[in-house]
Amino acid sequence: MLYKGDTLYLDWLEDGIAELVFDAPGSVNKLDTATVASLGEAIGVLEQQSDLKGLLLRSNKAAFIVGADITEFLSLFLVPEEQLSQWLHFANSVFNRLEDLPVPTIAAVNGYALGGGCECVLATDYRLATPDLRIGLPETKLGIMPGFGGSVRMPRMLGADSALEIIAAGKDVGADQALKIGLVDGVVKAEKLVEGAMAILRQAINGDLDWKAKRQPKLEPLKLSKIEAAMSFTIAKGMVAQTAGKHYPAPITAVKTIEAAARFGREEALNLENKSFVPLAHTNEARALVGIFLNDQYVKGKAKKLTKDVETPKQAAVLGAGIMGGGIAYQSAWKGVPVVMKDINDKSLTLGMTEAAKLLNKQLERGKIDGLKLAGVISTIHPTLDYAGFDRVDVVVEAVVENPKVKKAVLAETEQKVRPDTVLASNTSTIPISELANALERPENFCGMHFFNPVHRMPLVEIIRGEKSSDETIAKVVAWASKMGKTPIVVNDCPGFFVNRVLFPYFAGFSQLLRDGADFRKIDKVMEKQFGWPMGPAYLLDVVGIDTAHHAQAVMAAGFPQRMQKDYRDAIDALFNANRFGQKNGLGFWRYKEDSKGKPKKEEDVVVDDLLAKVSQPKRDFSEEEIIARMMIPMVNEVVRCLEEGIIATPAEADMALVYGLGFPPFHGGAFRWLDTLGSAKYLDMAQQYQHLGPLYEVPEGLRNKARHNEPYYPPVEPARPVGDLKTA
C-alpha cells in the first residue's frame, strides 16, 4: 500500500502501474474537502515514485464520484472571498499535479461522474466508461459554475459548442453521447472496465498511443478562429438569456468566463474561472439553489425512511377517468405499477385512455421508447365500467368531481369492493380528508393523495394525513408516489391542505389589488419578470380554471372565515358570472386561441376591462415593490401559520412543496428561504405597512417573535474552517 486515506487509497497494480481507488466509507464517493486534500497527498506520494510508469483511477462504489459534497457548500459559501479563492487555488493545484504527472493516466469511470467527479477525470489523459455512465457538470443548476477546472478543460477537449451546451445547461450525458463528443475514449461492459483501462494504459506506456499529444490541448488556449469564437459564444449567450434569464446569473457567467479564458493557457484560464466562481458562490441565488438541492435530499430521505417497512403497491386503481384520472393511470403504468381505471361513463374512459396514449406517443416521438414498450405500458392500464379486478388492488385513488357528496358516495361504494387491507385515497384539492373519512367503515385505511396537473410533469404529491389515517396507510401511498417518480410530502389535514391553503391568500392579494385599481396585466408582468413566478396570478387563474378557483375560494372561505371570507365581489366572481372560465372555454382574463401546435395562446380581450371595472375602483398605478409586497405577504403569512399549526412539518418540506407544487421561483428557494434572505425583522417592517388591508396581512405571532431577534427559520450555518485548515481537512 502506497497511501491510505479515509476516502481513497493508492497501491501498486503491476510493473510500475499504480491504481488510485476512491472508496469512501458510505455508499457513494463524494469529492469533499477532505477527499481533495487526501488526493493531493496521494499525488505527492506518486510524485516521489521514480519507477512509476502509469496511473489508473477507479472507484470501489457503484458510481465513480457523484460530485462534490453539497452539504459542505453553504458553509463554504460563507467563507470570505479571499479565503475561498485560496482554497480553490489549492484544489486546482491538486488536479494540475494529477494532470502533470510524467506518466500516462486513465480513469475507469462507472456510473455517475458529476461535478467534481467529472472535473477529476478531465484531468486524466484517457477515460474508459461503462454503459451506465452519466457524466457532466451540473453546477449552474446550483447557482455556481465549475470550480475545479471544468470550464477550462472541457472546452479544450470537446470544442466550445459541446462544452458550452453541457456547462451552461448544467446537464449530464450518457455513455453513447459522451463517446460521440469525445468526453470518454471508449465504453466497455462493467466486468471488462479495469481490464480495458489497463490495456489502454499499456499501449500508452509502450508508445502505441501518444498520451502527451492527448494531454497538450488542455494546457493551451482554445483552438478557435475569431469567427468561430464569435459564433459559438454569441449563440450560447443568446440561448442562455432566453432560457435562464436575469434571475440565474451562473449560466451566463460561465459562458462569459469560457469566452474570456479561450485565448489563455491553463494557468491563466483557471485564474479566470476562480475569479468568476467566488462571487457566484456568495450570491443569494446560489444559497437558495443549493438549499433546494439539500431540501430535496431531505424530503426524499424522509420518504425512504417512512416506507422502509412497507411493500410498494403492485396493483393500483383510479376512480374517475378523464384528463386527471388518465394522467395518474399513465404515470403509474409508466413506472411499472399496473392500474385499473374505472368510470361510470364510457366516454370518460375513452378520454382517460386517450390521455395516457397521447403521453406515451410523445415518448415514442422523442425516441424515449419503442412501439413494443408503448404497447406494453398501455396494456397495463385496464379501463372498466364496473369493479372487475378491484379485489386485487393494493391502493385506490379517487379522482371524481370535486363535490363532497359525490366523493363520499364513490368512496363508500368502493370500500365494499376491495380487500380489507386495501388503501383508499382521495385526489381532492380542498375538501378535508377527515370529512370524507366519515363515510367509510375503515377510515384508518384512508388518506388524501393530491396530484397536481399535469400529473406527468408536476413532481409534487401532497399526502394528507386524516384524523384517523394509520401510519401504514400513509407509508403505502408514499411508497406508491415514490414509485411513480414523484416527490411525496406528508401534510396534516385542513381545508386546502398546504399548497392550496397558501395559494388562495395569494389570489386574495391579487383580488384586492384589482379592487383597488391595479391592472392585472402589470401585476402578471411584475410577478413573472421581477419576482420570477412562471405565471402571473391572472394567467395562473386562467390555467387553473376560473370556475375551479371560484369553487375552491368558497371552500377556503368556509374553512378560514376570519381571514379568507371576503365582503365584496371580486374579479374571480365577475369572470365566473360572465361564464369566463379560463383556458378551458377560451375566455378568462385573456381570450385564448390554439396556435399551430394546438396549444392555447392568450390574446387581449377588451371586454375584461369593462367586467373588472364593475368590481374595482378607478385605475391607478402601483409600484413594482408594492405589487410584490401585497401579493407575497398573504402567502408567506399563511405558510408560516401552516408551520406553526403543524400542517407542514418543516421549513424544508414547505419550501419544496411550494417549488414543486406551485412553481415558486427556485432562485428564491421557497418562502422560508426568501424570508431568511430578506430577514424576519425586515419582513415584519414591510408587512406592517399593509396591515390595514385586513387579517391576511397580519403577521403571525411566531414570526413576530423571530423578528424581535431577527432569527432565521433554517438553522444558521457556520462558515467553513480557514483555508489553511481546509487544505489538510
From Swiss-Prot:
Amino-acid positions noted as binding NAD(+) in the UniProt annotation, renumbered to this chain: 324, 343, 400-402, 407, 429, 453
Enzyme Commission (EC) number: 4.2.1.17, 5.1.2.3, 5.3.3.8, 1.1.1.35
An individual GO BP term: fatty acid beta-oxidation
Annotated site residues (Important for catalytic activity) in this chain: 119, 139
InterPro entries xrefs: 3-OHacyl-CoA_DH_CS, 3-OHacyl-CoA_DH_NAD-bd, 3HC_DH_C, 6-PGluconate_DH-like_C_sf, ClpP/crotonase-like_dom_sf, Enoyl-CoA_hyd/isom_CS, Enoyl-CoA_hydra/iso, FA_oxidation_alpha_subunit
Pathway the protein takes part in: Lipid metabolism; fatty acid beta-oxidation
Domain of life: Bacteria
GO MF term set: 3-hydroxybutyryl-CoA epimerase activity; delta(3)-delta(2)-enoyl-CoA isomerase activity; enoyl-CoA hydratase activity; long-chain-3-hydroxyacyl-CoA dehydrogenase activity; NAD+ binding
Cited PROSITE patterns: 3HCDH, ENOYL_COA_HYDRATASE
Reactions mediated catalytically: a (3S)-3-hydroxyacyl-CoA + NAD(+) = a 3-oxoacyl-CoA + NADH + H(+); a (3S)-3-hydroxyacyl-CoA = a (2E)-enoyl-CoA + H2O; a 4-saturated-(3S)-3-hydroxyacyl-CoA = a (3E)-enoyl-CoA + H2O; (3S)-3-hydroxybutanoyl-CoA = (3R)-3-hydroxybutanoyl-CoA
Keywords: Fatty acid metabolism, Isomerase, Lipid degradation, Lipid metabolism, Lyase, Multifunctional enzyme, NAD, Oxidoreductase
A cellular component term, taken from the record's GO annotations: fatty acid beta-oxidation multienzyme complex
Family: In the N-terminal section; belongs to the enoyl-CoA hydratase/isomerase family.
PANTHER family per UniProt: TRIFUNCTIONAL ENZYME SUBUNIT ALPHA, TRIFUNCTIONAL ENZYME SUBUNIT ALPHA, MITOCHONDRIAL
UniProt cross-references to NCBIfam families, sorted A to Z: FadB, PRK11730.1
Biological role: Involved in the aerobic and anaerobic degradation of long-chain fatty acids via beta-oxidation cycle. Catalyzes the formation of 3-oxoacyl-CoA from enoyl-CoA via L-3-hydroxyacyl-CoA. It can also use D-3-hydroxyacyl-CoA and cis-3-enoyl-CoA as substrate.
HAMAP family according to UniProt: FadB
Subunit structure: Heterotetramer of two alpha chains (FadB) and two beta chains (FadA).
Full protein name: Fatty acid oxidation complex subunit alpha
UniProt gene name: fadB
